[in-house]
Amino acid sequence: MSVRSIHSSLPKMKTHKKTGVTLSIKNFVGITADKNYLPHHTWGSPKHGGDDYPDTSFKRQFETWGSKFVKRIIINIPFIGIKMAQILRAEGEKVFGATHNTIRSGNWYGNDTTWRMTLDLNRCLIYGNPDGTFRKTKKRYYSVIDGVIAMEGAGPMQGDPKECGVYISGEDPASVDTVATTLMGFDWRKLPVVYEAFSKHEMPISEIDPQTINIVSDIKDWRGSLDELREKEHFDFVPYFGWKGYIELPNYQKTNDK
């Protein structure tokens, strides 16, 4: 077998503001040269066909218009435009709120864009050939998630360290992510970047039935099925605030919140 037919993912175990978690599957967004070219959210609220933020108030709609205006300034007025944009953004935070405590840019559980982009990139990688064509069978795909020192809260870049002392590995990235998500204290069925990887597709990422996943561990309580793991004690990561109250498992220990 050609080395080009095998790929590996070595992600950190982290929360993510746009997808809830970033693990094996989300890690491969890094195959692109510049992530600024990738779609991460859609302008507006769900009512208007977007996933930028959940509410439909006039204030939020005005913010969307203002953001578009600022971006046009940056593009059309080089150098000066960037400085003007910095000033406008600083003033805008006083009116519309700062990003660290205001849902915007798709940083919440209603983001319906980033998970799609992520799965598309995974398909490009595991089915794509160097000449731009696609193969009929997927390449082998190994994942080893590093959860020795993980990240919770404002992931993927500004979160808090969380010592877990674990590695989670396997040959099916969706299955590995499902187990990792459960250990984080989250319901994988609430995270599209995980559960949609099991969906039927002409280029499937996983053809595994999640109910057949068998967990092998040196920790006895974690051995067995996903349903059994759900009932055990977890690490109970603090999710990004835009995902709080939506993805936690029923037995999640909220006393860990920061």
Positions of the model-derived regions?
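Extended, low-polarity segments enriched in aliphatic/aromatic residues
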Residues: 1-258
